[in-house]
Amino acid sequence: MRISTLLAFVAVFSAGVAATAPAVAADAACRFLPIADSAVPLQHTQKVAVLFSENTLNTQQYLERYHAVAVKGAQNPGLDSRISQAFVDSSDPQRAIGWLMTSLQKEFAAVTVYDNLDAALQAHPDVVVMLDTYSRLVSKRNDQVEARFMARFYDSNLQYIGQAQGSRAEQMPSVWVHGKAAPQIAAQINQQTVLQVNALKQFDASLKTLVTAGRVDHVASN
């Protein structure tokens, strides 16, 4: 990478993309504390209420800030377009949430997001889901990339049914050094997207297993 391109790269992303990764919320803020496990099986016919955990809300804010810097950086003529586009693509703040909601919609009859628990319970859902997500992307001060997705399922009395999850973590080689070609840097940054998608696919498999197990248990009990 040319010195001029490297300087543009550092100038654009050092400040904005060095944004602090979201802090991990206390465990109690990301789950309900049931008295007992639920005997309610998960089924395709159920109506599901979704709540976002504190981790999910913090992660969304982090991704939106990161993405805004990436989009602004893409307008810098001194920055190779392959690099800037890789940052834009890998920081899409809607990718994970959109994927997770689609996954739930494939497995249940109705899926609705609510702002708070009271609103969710007033809708009388069959199942309540706490969606807990965490993402961390590469920055000048961080080379550890993470993507964690978890959905905890509870019955209408907030007793625990089970959970689906997917996660990936990887330490990336530094992209902030002179001598690397732009295609190599872009490819490294694009690995963030690959990591996120692999974690989401793992979540899908886990969710399908959980719902299938619930259906089998329901049939066996009849």
Predicted regions and their residues:
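Sec/Tat-exported extracytoplasmic proteins
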Residues: 52, 100-108, 112, 200, ...
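Short, solvent-exposed, polar/charged sequence segments at loop or secondary-structure edges
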Residues: 85-134
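Surface-exposed short loop/turn segments
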Residues: 26-31, 116-163
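Generic short beta-strand segments
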Residues: 55, 132-136, 167-169
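A structural "domain/chain start" motif
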Residues: 23-97, 209-222
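Bacterial N-terminal signal peptides that target proteins for export
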Residues: 1-9
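C-terminal/domain-edge helix-coil "capping" segments
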Residues: 25-43, 157-222
